[in-house]
Amino acid sequence: RQGVAEARLLARWLRGRTTRVGIWGMSLGGLVAALTTTLDDDWDAVALWAPVAEPDEVLFNSGLVKFLREAVIQSGVSKDDFAAPEIASMMPNRSDTKIDPSKMLVVAGDYDQVVSPSSVERLSRRWGIEVHWVRHGHISLMLSRAPVRYTANFLEHTLFA
């Protein structure tokens, strides 16, 4: 929640200094960016790269966070605990965005082992946004020029057209 609060504060500050404001986040940053769109309707552009739309799925299914998962389970938390209504506000896949889908871009990797393609598909269906799929994993997505170029073009067109 702290990241979401800070992103919203920064956006408010920026809106006093410019005419258009967007947000771009990857992975957990994508979670923060996505959650801001469930609260605010005045983003001019939103780019989500491999967004963690279901933190519980990452925690309980990704092999890359095995040690964290083991610690959480040892503390007595189960996947069922994430079904609680209080948790829904932290799950983009259980919330609705306030942003027009034409102002949103999702980029995701076919080979992502952190944020599963099926999780991204569920977010895409719920929010009515298309996904730009690339042949990358979670980390290699950031290192490829093509998705960066695609996203930069989207932001330029959406923010400055």
Locate predicted features.
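Hydrolase active-site cap/lid region
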Residues: L35-D80, W133
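Catalytic histidine-centered segment of alpha/beta-hydrolase-like enzymes
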Residues: H136-R149
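Acidic catalytic loop of the alpha/beta-hydrolase fold
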Residues: D110-V115, H138-S140
